[in-house]
Amino acid sequence: MTSKANTGANRHKQAIIGTWKLISAEDRNSASDPWVPYTFGNPPSGYFIYDATGHGSIQIMTTPPQSIATPDSPTPVEALAIFNGYIAYYGTYTIDATNITEQVEGAWDPTQVGSAQVRPYKLSGDTLIIGDQITYKRTLQRVK
């Protein structure tokens, strides 16, 4: 990486460092379709955290959270709903002018461990939008 490219990457990294609260999560099938709330509720609950050392974590939970009849003893149906109502992973990240790439070290879904999650993003002040903005977008607000 050239010194100029390294300076640009560092500038992008400095801008993204912090804790970001998930404000909305929307999907659609094509650019001509209307946006619909992602399956985690409207609004969903979650945080994306990016630190200065290049580590990050993402957690998203269904709103309202899945209830269970007997605390600490979910039925198989309740356990599946809990699993399907939560996304979490952590690892390291790199960033450039257009993408955040998250190298997943651990995740609620073991199939993601070892994967690289490449996410296009746009940053404007304290608002971060992650997604291609054609079929998906996750809007976050910087926590102060």
Spans of model-derived segments:
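Lipid interaction determinants
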Residues: 1-144
